[in-house]
């Protein structure tokens, strides 16, 4: 999962040496397109919705919207489905990349 903001998107550039990554995230952004086109993200090892990018919504440029429109790799679901701990737990080796705006200890 990739969160909103500069830090999560900056992390994407450091994933270029990885392979067979999958995406299960509320939000899909432009930064992930390059990883898909490079074959880094192919969703082949996902244990929940294998072969599919699962997301609730997109935020980005015209390139992003054109890319996902009609693309069979994408499966858009309601946010409560994508964010359900029961569904997330079905993905083996799930990693979330987010930032915190505020932490109250």
What is each residue range found by the language model?
Residues 1-105:
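Conserved alpha/beta enzyme-core scaffold
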